[in-house]
């Protein structure tokens, strides 16, 4: 008996924001393009400032520079496709191209989750064990933490992409999204996806809940230690050290958890609009938060511009 032809679909079409009128899409294009350029520029500035200022050659800023690199590639993997789709609705992408986009999206997205965890551990050691900080957070330890984050990101992406694209796609090829994400792609499969969805949920729990728990434990210990500091000024400085990281953590995990840990939604437009926050807005938020809330970064930036650092 001949096998059914499961290779009927050779490319996917993005629904994107085609539901909006042309003039609305044009406004969105301009807004998202500005945010995209600002994201690339601000992350590049963070990297340059850290590279040129030897006072910032510490573990905390090493992690921040790696985070900026990850955010840049993460943005490049998604935003150009979205911007192009705003100008030309019903844009197509080949199945290998879709698999590649999903691979890079997952690699850098998961990498970010564990980088934030490593940064939380760095803050914990700095505040709770300051006398041993230089020993614990040596160059080798920092490289191992970053390498571990990248390896987890790559492994997760390989597993997920292999799982999703082993499914047969027969007739439906319209992705109800503006980029290749797991759930919208699995909806198009002409086979039972129960096991694949369970794998996705299990991985989501591992890469979202586990880092959140580790960061939460770190901050419980950090806050406990800070409250034991005698001087109000000392407590203020300690809290200020963690404020930027904590802001980024809350925003990142709050939005991604809402998308990937909630039950399947029938409102694909709502999911797309929420996805905009972590593919367009959050990558810009990180360098802005670290620049505005971190005195060392602000002073280094002012020195690079030839201006006097803040007193």
UniProtKB/Swiss-Prot annotation:
SUPFAM superfamilies registered for this protein in UniProt: Family A G protein-coupled receptor-like (SSF81321)
Location in the cell: Cell membrane
Organism for this UniProt entry: Homo sapiens (Human)
PROSITE patterns, alphabetized: G_PROTEIN_RECEP_F1_2
Molecular function in Gene Ontology: G protein-coupled receptor activity; odorant binding; olfactory receptor activity
Extracellular side, ranges: 1-29, 79-98, 171-202, 255-272
Entries under Pfam families matching the protein: 7tm_4 (PF13853)
Any one cellular-component term (Gene Ontology): membrane
Protein family according to the UniProt entry: Belongs to the G-protein coupled receptor 1 family.
One GO BP annotation of this record: detection of chemical stimulus involved in sensory perception of smell
Cystine connections: 98-180
Keyword Cell membrane: yes
Keyword Disulfide bond: yes
Keyword list, A-Z: Cell membrane, Disulfide bond, G-protein coupled receptor, Membrane, Olfaction, Receptor, Sensory transduction, Transducer, Transmembrane, Transmembrane helix
Cytoplasmic compartment segments: 51-57, 120-149, 224-237, 293-311
Chain's role: Odorant receptor.
Protein name: Olfactory receptor 10J4
Record InterPro entries: GPCR_Rhodpsn (IPR000276), GPCR_Rhodpsn_7TM (IPR017452), Olfact_rcpt (IPR000725)
Transmembrane segments: 30-50, 58-78, 99-119, 150-170, 203-223, 238-254, 273-292
């Amino acid at each position: 008996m001949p096998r059914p032809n499961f290779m009927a679909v050779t490319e996917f079409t993005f629904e994107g924001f085609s539901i909006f009128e042309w003039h609305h899409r044009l406004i969105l294009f301009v807004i998202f393009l500005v945010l995209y350029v600002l994201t690339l520029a601000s992350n590049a500035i963070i990297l340059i400032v850290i590279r040129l200022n030897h006072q910032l050659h510490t573990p905390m800023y090493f992690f921040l520079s790696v985070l900026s690199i990850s955010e840049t590639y993460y943005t490049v993997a998604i935003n150009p496709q979205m911007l192009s789709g705003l100008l030309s609705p019903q844009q197509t992408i080949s199945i290998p191209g879709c698999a590649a986009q999903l691979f890079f999206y997952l690699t850098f997205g998961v990498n970010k989750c564990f980088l934030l965890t490593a940064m939380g551990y760095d803050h914990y050691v700095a505040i709770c064990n300051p006398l041993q900080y230089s020993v614990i957070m040596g160059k080798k330890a920092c490289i191992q933490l970053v390498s571990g984050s990248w390896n987890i990101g790559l492994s997760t992406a390989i597993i997920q992409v292999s799982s999703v694209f082993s499914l047969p796609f027969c007739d439906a090829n319209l992705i109800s999204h503006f980029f290749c994400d797991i759930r919208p792609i699995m909806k198009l499969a002409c086979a039972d996806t129960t096991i694949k969805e369970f794998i996705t949920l299990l991985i989501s729990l591992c890469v979202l809940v586990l880092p959140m728990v580790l960061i939460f434990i770190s901050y419980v210990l950090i806050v406990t230690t800070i409250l034991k500091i005698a001087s109000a000024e000392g407590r203020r400085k300690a809290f200020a050290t963690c404020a930027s990281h904590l802001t980024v953590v809350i925003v990142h995990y709050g939005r991604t958890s809402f998308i990937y840990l909630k039950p399947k939604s029938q409102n694909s437009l709502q999911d797309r609009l929420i996805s905009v926050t972590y593919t367009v807005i959050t990558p810009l938020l990180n360098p802005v938060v670290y620049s505005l809330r971190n005195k060392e970064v602000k002073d280094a930036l002012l020195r690079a511009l030839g201006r006097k650092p803040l007193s």
